[in-house]
């Protein structure tokens, strides 16, 4: 899920907050979101991956009777035989099926959502299916597939190895990837902490831009151990959805656990462990450092200095809300700022639980930085349309005179530190070959002593 997706979800939440119904949505097939059919996300006790694969096979074979036998009544109402045939005709234009990838099953509230990559001669897609308790496909939609991630030029895979790891308490165990340089350690190590929302270990923005995978490869090639991991909001989305949670639950607690785990790994110098936080991860990095108490240094990438609600209002404006939606958004920000501790049961505001906002009430990342004596590097791409330059300037002014703090900006880089020209947009995140700029990898490597 990209930050844009999160904003659209928040806009919808604002409409509900104001009692406004969202108009019906029927996207064209063949552009952007290729098809959205059905409704009703519910939990299934059946084998969701097997059921979804069977539905996909029937779609590709254009066998409507057997497809309909797998579908919920709502899906059959939306996907009648005529619509099924039209979709099949469009799919036929994509050429022969060259490969069908493995199914990935996710918890999305009370549902199982199955994603299956399909590679055609002309394009690739992601087919997604939701399965309900009756063992029926209740939602089907086809999305543009991920272009294959290709290593940046600075990635030297012969210089490091990668291994799957798991860490954390039994209730919230998280999978991750540990990149370890070849040779004799001990090596400095970096923990990568992601941006806002249920984002993956690669900090993926769009379908092919994976800044943390770039950083991991680049730093490991330079002799740095790197740990990246799935966020709790992604790994346990079903358990988190609709329940009150805080910034500690979303990010801080797992980052502290990951740091403890990283220090125990073979080849790691436990006294040279650093944290690199992007977006929300950078905003919360000073809190994580305070909780951990052992970090050798911090890198804050595209981190907001202002309160989160102010940043979200800016992003909603950038997403184009106006009129009554804008009035409601501003009212929501005012409500957040007026929350008191006895308001913990207040319904979600701007898409986040009241306890989340209360947890951050009074949190000042620059003030927390001033409590730290460790080296801190603040990085900013001047083409960032998600975190305005206002925040970078505030970091510099708030921390002027702090000898342990270095701030650096890059005129050509965007929010994910990819180079470009002109105003940055969400479309940049979908551009093949988008990688974190080599100068950013170089600056971070030098910061950690490599």
Give residue ranges: language-model regions:
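Short solvent-exposed beta->alpha transition segments
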Residues: 50, 54-57, 61-112
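N-terminal cap/lid segment of alpha/beta-hydrolase-fold proteins
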Residues: 147-184
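Short, surface-exposed "cap/lid" segments of acyl-processing enzymes
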Residues: 183-218
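Conserved alpha/beta-hydrolase
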Residues: 214-238
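Alpha/beta-hydrolase active-site loop
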Residues: 244-266
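Accessory cap/linker subdomain of secreted extracellular hydrolases
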Residues: 291, 297-371, 401
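Short beta-strand/loop motif that positions the catalytic acidic residue
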Residues: 372, 378-380
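Catalytic active-site module of serine/aspartate enzymes centered on a nucleophile-bearing elbow/loop
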Residues: 416, 422-450
């Amino acid at each position: 899920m990209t930050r844009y997706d999160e904003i659209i979800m928040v806009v919808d939440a604002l409409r509900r907050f104001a009692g406004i119904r969202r108009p019906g949505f029927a996207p064209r097939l063949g552009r952007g979101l290729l098809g959205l059919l059905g409704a009703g996300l519910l939990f299934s006790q059946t084998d969701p991956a097997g059921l979804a694969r069977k539905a996909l096979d029937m779609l590709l074979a254009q066998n409507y009777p057997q497809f309909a036998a797998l579908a919920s009544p709502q899906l059959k109402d939306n996907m009648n035989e005529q619509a099924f045939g039209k979709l099949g005709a469009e799919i036929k234009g994509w050429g022969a099926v060259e490969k069908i990838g493995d199914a990935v099953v996710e918890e999305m509230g009370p549902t199982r959502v199955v994603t299956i990559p399909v590679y055609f001669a002309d394009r690739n897609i992601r087919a997604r299916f939701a399965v309900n308790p009756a063992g029926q496909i209740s939602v089907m939609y086809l999305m543009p597939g991920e272009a294959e991630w290709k290593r940046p030029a600075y990635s030297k895979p012969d210089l490091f190895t990668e291994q799957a790891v798991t860490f954390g308490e039994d209730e919230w165990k998280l999978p991750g990837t540990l990149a370890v340089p070849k040779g004799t350690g001990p090596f400095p190590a970096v923990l990568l902490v992601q941006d806002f929302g249920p984002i993956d270990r690669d900090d993926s923005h769009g379908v092919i831009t994976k800044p943390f995978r770039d950083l991991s490869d680049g730093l490991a090639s330079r002799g740095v151990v790197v740990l990246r991991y799935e966020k709790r909001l992604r790994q346990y989305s079903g358990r988190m959805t609709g329940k009150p949670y805080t910034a500690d639950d979303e990010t801080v607690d797992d980052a502290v656990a990951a740091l403890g785990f990283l220090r125990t790994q073979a080849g790691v110098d436990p006294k040279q462990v650093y944290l690199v936080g992007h977006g929300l991860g950078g905003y919360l990095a000073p809190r994580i450092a305070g909780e951990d108490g052992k970090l050798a240094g911090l890198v804050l990438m595209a981190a907001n200095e202002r309160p989160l609600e102010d940043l979200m209002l800016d992003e909603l404006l950038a997403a184009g809300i106006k009129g009554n939606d804008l009035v409601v958004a501003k009212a929501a920000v005012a409500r957040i700022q007026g929350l008191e501790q006895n308001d913990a049961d207040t319904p979600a505001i701007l898409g986040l639980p009241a306890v989340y906002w209360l947890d951050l009430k009074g949190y000042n990342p620059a003030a927390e930085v001033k409590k730290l004596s460790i080296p801190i590097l603040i990085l900013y791409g001047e083409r960032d349309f998600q975190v305005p330059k206002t925040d970078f300037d505030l970091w510099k002014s708030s921390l002027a005179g702090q000898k342990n703090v270095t701030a650096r900006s890059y005129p050509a880089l965007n929010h994910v530190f990819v180079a470009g020209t002109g105003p940055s947009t969400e479309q940049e995140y979908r551009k093949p070959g988008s990688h974190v700029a080599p100068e950013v990898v170089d600056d971070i490597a030098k910061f950690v002593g490599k």
